Amino acid sequence: MWANLQFCFRSICKIKSRKLRIFVFMANLLLKPTFGNVHGSHEAYDHKSSKLFIELGQRHLASYVVNSKTNQILAYEFFQLNDKLTPSLLNGYIIDKNFSLNAFEGVFFVHNQKEFALVPADFHKNHLDKSILETIHGDLISLQTQSDELPQWEIVNIFGIEKSIYDSILAILPDAKHIHINSIYLKSAFKQLVNMHDQWIKVYFYPSYFNVVVMKDAQLQIMQSFYYETADDVIYFLINLTDQFLLDVTALHMQVSGLIEEEFITFKELKKYFLNVSPEVNPELNFVKGQEPHQPLHYFTPLFLSSQCV
């Protein structure tokens, strides 16, 4: 009997070890580390007084942990995806980091995806969410619908999560909350309205795409994602937006953040076409002393907004 138990235990260990090796191999193929301050599991903090944020982007996967009281950034890492995010890759990442084994004060998934729609709060009906998303984005991918109420703007942001991704999250982190990145942008923008100019554009850069928020006279004009390959693509899309909403390129203020270098061609081209362009550095960034990043601080602005807006 004991021999059988030993055999079973060794067999289970071998299976788990094999699965771990497979995940590490797949992760090395699909996840390209971009920046971060952790290696292996996030262990060096009190989980019960911390919040975990996992951002699922169109071309990236990121996570970070903040102290619930001070909002100090305790751990973070950002990966570019070489292919589409799959449930198995996401689950493997969560398990590898021991996120599912620790009792965080709160766990939040930030969905940085294009499947969303802004609906006036007075006209929002829950039973129509799925139809609205399918009308705008199609029905080729099965989506789990979610919504964020934004009373400051009197709108509701309805968004879709790929059903297989949502189900995998539900199975491993059932108490996690879900929020869309555009809801984060709008909550952040509302806090800044008093100090904003009449016309402004915020541009958040991610791997292979950027998100845009356009404001005019304290009113939201558009929120949209654009895929790009060259600096010319970025200029083309932004000039079109200024024409569409009758913005004055000599008067509007543009703030850029995320994965864009000031010395690279994209930023330099923006400065040619728009007079008032500047990197946006989040003044509330609070890193652990001695763990300040080597990257420019505007890299982190869009990633850490979520902890300040939930």
Predicted regions and their residues:
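Hydrophobic/aromatic-enriched cytosolic interaction surfaces used to assemble or bind macromolecules
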Residues: 2-310
